[in-house]
A protein has these predicted regions:
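Nucleic-acid endonuclease domains
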Residues: 1-65, 70-221
Length: 221
């Protein structure tokens, strides 16, 4: 499906609010029968993206290409009788080789998080992705880098780049930054970079505490 604006995209998804994921899966099967969903940890995102005809893929470009919008899930969980984000949001793996020659303005990370439409859904305590059909889609929340913490995220990225350029990628820690984290990724695989140096695989992420504040400020206002 092609959308002419982010407003149109958000309006489309609003029609599915308060529906459980099983109902949404049935919608996809009726309207996009060619899409085959994979029951793995990414199943919730697959179901929600399939509502616009997106099949599971590994394309590094934004999911809604003409609008430059990335689609990501934001699971929510009850805490003190309120719903809050359950975890950080992983963006993409840090490429220790390509970051050496990138500038912030042309970086792939900046392009990737320019705009993110988060899919909000409740994942009750004690439930795992295997219970996905019971989860309820609650709506969307738009993250716009130009509006939301741009300079902090830019500085966090520059600090990550500085460590990699100094051949200190092995010292990266999520605690080093304010918003954009360098979190552990995968099984801790060792990555080689700049010829001689090694560090454990890490991914860019929007940190958990930041997402909680972002959600409370933007969605709850």
């Amino acid at each position: 499906m092609i959308f002419s604006s982010e407003k149109e995209l958000i309006s489309y998804y609003s029609k599915f609010r308060n529906s459980n994921l099983n109902t949404l899966k049935n919608f996809t099967q009726s309207n996009f029968p060619e899409i085959k969903l994979k029951t793995n940890k990414g199943i919730v995102g697959q179901v929600l993206e399939s509502l616009i005809g997106n099949a599971p893929n590994n394309d590094p470009n934004p999911d809604v290409l003409n609008l430059g919008i990335e689609l990501k899930v934001m699971p929510l969980r009850k805490s003190s009788n309120s719903l809050v984000p359950k975890e950080r949001s992983k963006i993409k793996k840090i490429n220790y080789n390509s970051i050496l020659d990138e500038s912030w303005d042309t970086s792939f990370l900046k392009k990737k998080i320019s705009k993110i439409l988060f899919f909000l859904y409740e994942q009750p305590i004690g439930k795992t992705y295997r219970d996905w059909e019971e989860f309820t889609f609650l709506g969307t929340l738009l993250f716009d880098l130009q509006v939301d913490s741009y300079h902090i995220i830019k500085n966090d990225w520059l600090e990550i780049q500085k460590k990699v350029k100094s051949h200190l990628a092995h010292e990266l820690s999520e605690g080093d930054s304010k918003v954009l984290g360098a979190c552990t990724s995968g099984t801790g695989k060792i990555e080689k970079y700049d010829g001689l140096y090694e560090a454990k695989e890490r991914s860019y992420s929007l940190k958990h505490n930041y997402l909680k504040l972002f959600y409370l400020e933007k969605y709850k206002k």
